UniProtKB/Swiss-Prot annotation:
Domain of life: Bacteria
Residues the record lists as binding Mg(2+): 40, 69
Family assignment from sequence similarity: Belongs to the HAM1 NTPase family.
Name the UniProt record assigns to this protein: dITP/XTP pyrophosphatase
Single GO MF descriptor: ribonucleoside triphosphate phosphatase activity
EC number: 3.6.1.66
Subunit structure: Homodimer.
Cofactor detail note: Binds 1 Mg(2+) ion per subunit.
Listed InterPro entries: dITP/XTP_pyrophosphatase (IPR020922), ITPase-like_fam (IPR029001), RdgB/HAM1 (IPR002637)
Active site: 69 (proton acceptor)
Alphabetical keyword list: Hydrolase, Magnesium, Metal-binding, Nucleotide metabolism, Nucleotide-binding
Binding site for substrate: 10-15, 70, 147-150, 170, 175-176
Amino acid sequence: MDNVPLVIASGNKGKIGEFKKLLDDFPIDLLTQPVGFEIEETGSTFMENARIKAIAVSQATGNLSLADDSGLSVEALGGAPGIYSSRYASSDKQRIEKLLAELKPFSNRKAKFECALCIASGEKVLIEVSGFCEGLITFFPKGQNGFGYDPIFEVSGLGETYAEMDHEKKKHIGHRGNAFKLLIPKLKQLLGSMKK
């Protein structure tokens, strides 16, 4: 059987790169969403936004679509930036600076990353999973790897930020890796059923 086309519902190069590494062993052809394709994220949770994106891209392309909505929730900030993580400011650097400034008056630096994944075919949702990683917000950026808030998110018990980890380590303990651990058996089952 030929590889199954699967469109990644994202224009984020960092996410696309991680998806490609995480799904490297699957009989799928990973495609990116059409250039300039914009989806309004109107959900109130990460999963609702992942669902909206997966359905929209699947309907637009006629292929299976995999969407991720993920972000950072900081306890002292009432869960902010949450679903607005990527829209918190206009660049990664500005987002980090804003978050560190808002967190300055607080001693509680607990945070968690969440990743919601959804695979859709047309308007039908086929798979939904979520993964998490608990940690703390550092006082200043540390590390050169990763993207987004990675330089200020220190994983609980490890003493390293995501940006200080190599891809393999982040894949095994990070929120996206944890979500993919749940997705992979379901994706294998889905692909197996498509062969019949």
